[in-house]
Curated annotation (Swiss-Prot):
Transmembrane segments: none annotated. InterPro entries: FAD/NAD-bd_sf, GMC_OxRdtase, GMC_OxRdtase_N, GMC_OxRtase_C. Glycans are attached at N160, N173, N357, N364, N480. Homodimer. The lineage of its organism: Eukaryota, Fungi, Dikarya, Ascomycota, Pezizomycotina. This is Dehydrogenase xptC. Its cofactor is FAD. PROSITE patterns: GMC_OXRED_2. Disruption phenotype: Impairs the production of the xanthones shamixanthone and epishamixanthone; and accumulates variecoxanthone A and emericellin. Residues 1-18 form the signal peptide. Its EC number is 1.1.-.-. Belongs to the GMC oxidoreductase family. It comes from Emericella nidulans (strain FGSC A4 / ATCC 38163 / CBS 112.46 / NRRL 194 / M139) (Aspergillus nidulans). GO terms for biological process: secondary metabolite biosynthetic process; shamixanthone biosynthetic process.
Length: 622
């Protein structure tokens, strides 16, 4: 009877039409939501959700409600001043993964934002795109228009790039290609205005071992050595977040409501049509409902979008039946295909460290205070760098990573491996089929010299992070209860495909080669971790099981945009198979991980999603 009442209420709203909401600021209370009507409900106010909501509400007659599980930040220094960076206050609490079988059953916290603006509030601000091959790989999975040529206009539309000064560009060997950068979009980005002096030696070392400069890592190829652009507003030298770029400018629109600190429990359906959502306070409380006359757009993130779908009856049949959830659409791919980028740490001491460096910043309060004075005067300052990062990065192709090592056969061994051996034994045949196709695409990508599979980042003193950005392993995220406030079951299944260990071994040796180059060797580095005793593959893998990090906070791909017969969940228009009026518009819709940090690509994909939605409703010219 309760469900019937909900549907009858929704139908009565449809008869009245989706009226424009009352004229007040976007941030609203639950009571105000109950007295309003909406065309669209966006589940999640992260980068994707805010981008799409902003673009839809540019049309005055289109009303949108965004429901975000977290708060709106208060403009704290630890968010907006890069040198004060602290992510923990806005991280989802208690979100841990299952014991990782290949990592000695270690348990890790999953880093997920719970705040308006999502990852753009808590990440390290790196603003790199995926490569042309990354997106062409998406398109080859049946997603027409999602290749590089289809995405590049949306990168340009989303961005507002500020060029560095000639002096900074010369000092930091910063180069770029203006023709592929956007200059009129909402998302401001540039380069921090301070260069640690030791980074010049890293640049020389990279050149010495054959890593070439990259003119522009955002131009479709991202291998080489380069300075990373950051999501920083060069007018204020503060973090450029989705909250500031896509929320603040729209805050006074009467057709845009934002409900914070509120969790969506499930999508409401009339048959197979999504008509609204149930929601409750994130701290706990009673269930309320809101209705969408046109569509529900899910953007809850790669770990929570599958949870929302599964709680709503969209997901693997066996899972839903076990929890007595009525099945709306049997989609085995919901929650499968989870991916993230792994990190292996190096630790060094130095006989002659180049200073000032990151340790100077962290430990010398006098110097740090002097630098803060410069920052507050908008002068060059270390405070424009996301603490404790340095902007120089070396990204390696598969060929670069394995050159001059005994590991050139890694890819051949991977191709000989049965894809089923890398997935759970009970995996659905369609998901297995999709994974097998993804592997073939990845094998082709890895042969290209312009696509990065891994890289190194040095903080200018003790710490180096070595990344595998294109893992073969696939994990999952599933619910095990119907409480919408309970965390889902998460397992990255790191190194379930041993190719990922082998690639990390090759990258480890490449890192050692880099620091043995004359410009860095002259400083007298001593490798503490892994340490000189760790040499054999067996020793390296043993250590990786102890210290490898399975998540870089770049979770993706858990509701993939692929054909249904390949375990896909979404059409190329991001529509959920077996339903109407329901789309997934966040990073969950990616079929496979990109070769770099995701933020810039999330903005661009959000712009594309907004245009797809506008086009289908006849609003594209608005």
């Amino acid at each position: 009877m309760a469900k019937l009442s909900v549907i009858l209420l929704f139908r009565s709203l449809l008869l009245c039409g989706a009226l424009t909401v009352s004229r007040h600021a976007t941030l609203v209370t639950e009571r105000e939501v109950q007295s309003s009507k909406y065309d669209f409900i966006v589940v999640g106010g992260g980068v994707s959700g805010l981008t799409v909501a902003d673009r839809l509400t540019e049309i005055p007659d289109v009303s949108v409600l965004v429901i975000e599980a977290g708060p709106v930040d208060r403009g704290e220094d630890f968010v907006y001043v890069p040198g004060s960076y602290e992510r923990d206050p806005y991280i989802w609490p208690g979100l841990t993964n299952e014991p990782s079988a290949e990592l000695n059953n270690r348990v890790f916290d999953s880093v997920v934002a719970r705040v308006a603006g999502g990852g753009s509030i808590v990440n390290a601000m790196i603003f790199l795109r995926g490569t042309a091959l990354d997106f062409d790989g998406w398109e080859s999975l049946g997603n027409h228009g999602w290749g590089w040529e289809g995405m590049l206009p949306y990168f340009i539309k989303s961005e507002n790039f500020t060029r560095p000064t000639p002096e900074l560009a010369h000092e930091g060997n910063i180069t770029w290609d203006d023709s592929v950068r956007g200059h009129d979009g909402p998302v401001r980005y540039s380069y921090p205005n301070y260069i640690y002096p030791g980074l010049g030696r890293l640049y020389e070392a990279a050149l010495h071992i054959g890593i070439q400069p990259r003119l522009d890592p955002n131009g479709g190829q991202n291998t080489g050595v380069f300075n990373q652009p950051f999501a920083i507003d060069a007018a204020t030298w503060t973090r450029s977040s989705a909250r500031r770029n896509h929320y603040d400018p729209a805050v006074s629109r009467p057709n845009y409501h934002f409900l914070s600190d509120t969790t969506v429990a499930r999508v409401i359906f009339d048959g197979t049509r999504a008509v609204g959502v149930e929601y409750l306070p994130s701290r706990g409380g009673g269930i309320s409902t809101a209705f969408a006359a046109k569509e529900v757009l899910v953007a809850a993130g790669a770990l929570h979008t599958p949870q929302v779908l599964q709680l709503s009856g969209v997901g693997p049949r066996d899972l839903l039946e076990a929890l007595n959830i009525p099945i709306i659409s049997d989609l085995p791919g919901v929650g499968s295909n989870l991916q993230d980028q792994t990190t292996f740490p190096f630790v060094y001491t130095w006989d002659s460290a180049v200073t000032p460096n990151v340790t100077t910043f962290l430990t010398n309060t006098t110097w740090a205070t002097e630098q803060r004075v410069l920052y507050d005067q908008h002068l060059p300052s270390v405070w424009t760098l996301t603490r404790p990062l340095a902007p120089k990065f070396a990204f390696l192709s598969y060929e670069d990573a394995t050159a001059n090592t005994a590991y050139a056969s890694i890819l051949d061994d991977a191709q000989a491996r049965d894809p089923a051996d890398s997935l759970p034994g009970d995996i659905h045949p369609t998901v297995l089929a999709g994974y097998a196709v993804q592997r073939q695409i990845m094998f082709n990508e890895f042969r290209d010299a312009g696509l990065a599979v891994g890289g190194m980042s040095w903080d200018t003193d003790a710490n180096v992070q070595v990344f595998n950005v294109k893992p073969f392993s696939r994990g999952y995220v599933y619910i095990n209860q119907t409480d919408p406030l309970a965390n889902p079951v998460i397992d990255f299944r790191t190194a379930s495909d041993p190719t990922d260990f082998q690639l990390h071994i090759a990258l480890l040796h490449k890192q050692r080669e880099l620091f043995n180059a004359p410009s860095l060797a002259a400083l007298g580095p001593t490798e503490v971790v892994p340490g000189p005793a760790v040499q054999t593959d067996e020793d390296i893998i043993k250590l990786m099981r102890e210290i490898l990090q399975p998540s870089n906070g770049h979770q993706c791909c858990s509701a993939p945009m692929m054909p249904r017969e390949l375990g896909g969940v979404l059409s190329p228009e991001m529509k959920v198979y077996g339903t109407t009026g329901l789309r997934v518009i966040d990073i969950s819709h990616w079929p496979k991980e990109l070769s770099g940090p995701p933020m810039a690509s999330i903005y661009a994909a959000g712009e594309k999603a907004a245009d797809i939605i506008k086009g289908e409703h006849g609003w594209l010219g608005n």
